[in-house]
Regions:
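C-terminal motif of bacterial Sec signal peptides marking the signal peptidase cleavage site
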Residues: 21-24
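Short, well-ordered beta-strand elements
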Residues: 30-42, 60-66, 172-177
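Ligand-binding cleft/hinge of the Venus flytrap
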Residues: 50-58, 149-150, 157, 165-201, ...
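Short helix-initiation/N-cap motifs at beta->coil->alpha
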Residues: 63-76, 202-214
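Ligand-binding "clamshell"
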Residues: 97-109, 115-132, 218-223, 232-246
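A conserved helix-loop-strand patch within extracytoplasmic ligand-binding domains
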Residues: 111-175, 277-281
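Periplasmic-binding protein-like
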Residues: 125-129, 135-142, 206, 229-276
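Ligand-binding pocket segment of bilobal, Venus flytrap-like solute-binding proteins
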Residues: 171-243
Length: 311
């Protein structure tokens, strides 16, 4: 076991032991909807979008509990009644929470529909949590490179590579950078390597997601596992290699809401219906970049999006 993996394993064990204490020791909640979000920019933006829409349309005061440390903490907070809702991604819900294998239907639309149906059914049966209609975009994993061989350095053979299949036989010269979660997840690195027969140069460099793009720009790595709605992709004109074998499952952004909360505040359903299909992948990239790249306040960015879309 490498030192990095030992640290991650130890951290995971500590987090597992502390989780009940962390959830139970959260501050007591008030009689108002509590909105959660995981600890990265897109999640905070989406949490703020839910909050502003509920305040404006349902005329309810809401509590924001953002920066939860990952899907597992968010899910446990839902089950404990510490939060009432947050936005999750269908592929993450299916594989990381429900522990189901990804669906790999040949037709992309059927795959999206089947994954959403499975998540909707099992969340209701197991957790009494309702999956609302998708917001309109998915945030899948994305294998990202600098846009041309010149920028990538000599001898890497990236010119003309547009898909992951075309990377086979060349990637052994590429240094890979990944986030901690991607290396360990069932729908992450090891499965990707197996699905395509990919081999990279040496061990992957693991780091916080926010550092991946810096490492790519400074030539510390040659390819990274990012997210398809990351702001730097468009802002820095980076190239996403197409997942032409459809390895990654759909990751539609879907609000998850405790059924108890929907019974307590039935007007919430109208809010989620109004948001359905309103956020495109380009919208999400632009908001992420506005916060991360332009250092704008999340609430201001969300208000601008709502105004531009008549929300």
């Amino acid at each position: 076991m490498t030192l990095a993996r030992y640290k991650r394993t130890t951290a995971g064990l500590v987090a597992s032991c502390l989780l009940p204490w962390l959830v139970s020791c959260a501050p007591p909640r008030l009689d108002e909807p509590v909105i959660g979000a995981k600890n990265f920019t897109e999640q905070v933006v989406l949490g703020e979008l839910l909050a502003q829409e509920i305040e404006a349309r349902a005329h309810l005061k809401v509590e924001r509990r953002f920066y939860l440390a990952g899907s597992y903490i968010a899910q446990q907070s839902m089950l404990a009644g510490r939060i009432d809702m947050y936005v999750e991604y269908t592929g993450t819900a299916l594989t990381a929470i429900l522990k189901k294998p990804p669906l790999h239907l040949a037709d992309a639309a059927q795959n999206e529909a089947a994954s959403l149906a499975e998540v909707t059914k099992l969340y209701q049966q197991r957790f009494q949590i309702a999956a609302m209609q998708p917001l309109g975009f998915e945030n899948t994993f994305a294998m990202i490179v600098r846009p041309d061989e010149t920028a990538s350095g000599p001898g890497l053979g990236m010119a003309g590579v547009d898909t992951l299949s075309e990377a086979v036989g060349k990637a052994q010269n590429w240094r890979l950078g990944v986030g901690y979660e991607f290396e360990e997840r069932p729908d992450g690195l090891r499965g990707l390597e197996k699905a395509y027969g990919l081999h990279f140069k040496g061990e992957p460099r693991t780091m916080d997601l926010g550092l991946l793009y810096r490492a790519l720009a400074s030539h510390q790595v040659d390819i990274i596992a990012g997210n398809s709605t990351d702001g730097p992709i468009a802002a820095e004109h980076l190239k996403v290699l197409a997942d032409d074998r459809h390895y990654f499952p759909p990751y539609q952004a879907v609000p998850l809401v405790r059924e108890a909360a929907l019974k307590r505040w039935p007007q919430l359903r109208g809010v989620f219906a109004e948001l359905a299909g309103k956020v495109t992948a380009n919208d999400m990239r632009a908001m992420n970049e506005a916060v991360d790249g332009e250092h704008k306040d999340v609430a201001v960015v969300v208000r601008g999006f709502r105004a531009a879309h008549g929300l």
